[in-house]
């Protein structure tokens, strides 16, 4: 089984959401993962303690603490530099992945020979109640059309080949 490196950057998310986010990745049906957690708020002791405890408890976690707040793009690039997986996935620190997200996305990516895939999302409120859906286009022409208006990939839902990010040299700070 190929390794999927999951990038999760955090700055000031409430701990209850951060825990749910981490647990949703650690409990995936696809278990050959590396969860890279980048802490971009080293002054927040409660978060640092929680993340360090997770890293001690699960060897799949690579925990990185930025020396100061460097922003999301630089944090993502720091995570990419530490990724060991053939595939890279994104996860936000206040989102919850379905149990089979990575398994389904990897299967779809491999069967279709795509470089990157994303998915729709269910919107939930602070109590976990479903309040709506974020649907993205799947037809090639619709995807091209949406690109004119800012894109259609929900960033924390994608999974892609590592080679794509190497070719692009990571995230660009100009966006």
Which residue stretches match the model-derived regions?
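N-proximal low-complexity "stem/linker" segments adjacent to membrane-targeting elements
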Residues: 1-26
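Acidic donor-diphosphate engagement hotspot in glycosyltransferases and nucleotidyltransferases
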Residues: 17, 46-47, 76, 97-102, ...
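Short aromatic/hydrophobic "clamp" motif used to bind/position activated sugar donors
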Residues: 88
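The conserved acidic donor/metal-binding loop of glycosyltransferases
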Residues: 92-96, 120
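Conserved donor NDP-sugar-binding/catalytic core segment of glycosyltransferases
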Residues: 100-132
